[in-house]
Amino acid sequence: MLPSQSPAIFTVSRLNQTVRLLLEREMGQVWISGEISNFSQPSSGHWYFTLKDDNAQVRCAMFRNSNRRVTFRPQHGQQVLVRANITLYEPRGDYQIIVESMQPAGEGLLQQKYEQLKAQLTAEGLFEQKHKQALPSPAHCVGVITSKTGAALHDILHVLRRRDPGLPVIIYPTSVQGDDAPGQIVRAIALANARQECDVLIVGRGGGSLEDLWSFNDERVARAIFASQIPIVSAVGHETDVTIADFVADLRAPTPSAAAEIVSRNQQELLRQLQSGQQRLEMAMDYFLASRQRRFTQLFHRLQQQHPQLRLARQQTALERLRQRMRIAVESQLKRAEQRQKRTVQRLNHYNPQPRIHRAQSRIQQLEYRLAEIMRGRLSERRERFGNAVTHLEAVSPLATLARGYSVTSVSDGTVLKQTKQVKTGDLLTTRLKDGWVESEVKQIAPVKKTRARKPSPTKPAE
């Protein structure tokens, strides 16, 4: 059984990952010198090779985005100096380095020293902007620390004579290349500070290789420039050449000629500046006077506008405008009221009952006339019918029959006597005549014999 406090158990993947992270975090970026072997460049453009010495070797990879900055083609057996990151290729567990830059061994060692000194001085704060001194403007005397036979001195003097012929120049000749050069440059800077003859120094030389410019990467020169009480302009090599002196100097010029232009005054430019300043001053004065004149005119107009008579006139004008507005408003109100009245009258006329009453009365009169006509027609018709009925009634009336000589006899109970069997001898009868009544007593009842009517004889048809 495993003990209760057993160590952690790693998988292979986790082990490789942990080792890779330790290498990358603890080692960081390093400089390595060695001999190239097994160099290859597949279609991807990356470089793969082995870096070795007499006792060991290590696999290297340099990716395309890094190797495109290398200015030479690496060869088998070539001694190089590389700047690389140490890592582990996890899938195979191979320890390798990822190369960021590569240089031939000679220049590479110098570059390594350059980077180390740069990092050291950066950590000490020698490059910080707060230590930079401002250049005098204008400079009253210029000191030049360079070779008295070099092209740099010729270029500096040529520019100074062209731009500012009256500017004093003090030359502190010194060697700028070789083992003695750093010490001579340091002594020249100290001499210039001790004599205090100039208020700005140009320290530099012409272009060259890294070895040629190495005097200006010397720590002694860098510290002498930093300690100088006189502002220093570095002018080493060409624009692409950057030395430690450039970082520690108060100002870096890309070339010696540019340094001379920086510390000198261009008399023609000064004249143009004076003329431009005079023109700006005249324009400013003209503008000031014109603005004062405009201001005076504005104040004068304001005073005139504040005069009581003008204020009264403005108030009268405003009053007249108000009066006109009031008149227009009243007229407008009256017109609108009149229009509303007309519309109201029109609506009242439209709904007035008098015309309707007249129409109704006319209708009633027409109906009364028609009714009277109808009534007259009906009365005439009824009179005619009544007359006909009267005539007919008179024709069938018993009275009319009586008037023709007939009479009506009724028995005692009022029943009209129609047959003899209705009475007997001794009954009283009442007879109605045309002009009165006659009462009689039955004395005798004698029935009448019935006679049969003859049938008409048939007639012969005519022959």
Swiss-Prot record:
Main localisation: cytoplasm
What's the short name of a Pfam family annotated to this entry? tRNA_anti_2
What's the protein here called? Exodeoxyribonuclease 7 large subunit
| Quaternary state and interactors | Heterooligomer composed of large and small subunits.
Which InterPro entries does this chain map to? Answer: Exonuc_VII_L (IPR003753), Exonuc_VII_lsu_C (IPR020579), OB-fold_nuc-bd_dom (IPR025824)
> Catalysed reaction per UniProt?
Exonucleolytic cleavage in either 5'- to 3'- or 3'- to 5'-direction to yield nucleoside 5'-phosphates
User: What gene codes for this chain?
Assistant: xseA
Q: Can you tell me which family this protein belongs to?
A: Belongs to the XseA family.
Q: Which organism is it from?
A: Klebsiella pneumoniae subsp. pneumoniae (strain ATCC 700721 / MGH 78578)
Q: Which UniProt keywords apply?
A: Cytoplasm, Exonuclease, Hydrolase, Nuclease
Q: Where in the cell is it found?
A: Cytoplasm
Known EC number: 3.1.11.6
GO BP field: DNA catabolic process
Q: State whether keyword Nuclease applies.
A: yes
Describe the task this protein carries out: Bidirectionally degrades single-stranded DNA into large acid-insoluble oligonucleotides, which are then degraded further into small acid-soluble oligonucleotides.
One MF term in GO for this entry? Answer: nucleic acid binding
Task: Offer a single GO CC term for the protein.
Answer: exodeoxyribonuclease VII complex
